[in-house]
Amino acid sequence: IVVKTSQLQIHDMTINEAALQLESSRSEFVVFRDLESERVSVIYRRHDDDYGLIVPEL
């Protein structure tokens, strides 16, 4: 069941820039377009405080 829907702006950035943005925010994830691959990706905080990266295959 979807309880809430949000719209996000997707910005072009490197994976490192996305990691820095995540570090400086309270968000659990950042959705961005990877400048190298030109793919929409998601970097997120893992339960062990490391970061994970989701790169969907199209």
Name each model-derived stretch.
Residues 1-58:
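N-terminal, polar/charged subdomain of small-to-medium soluble alpha/beta proteins
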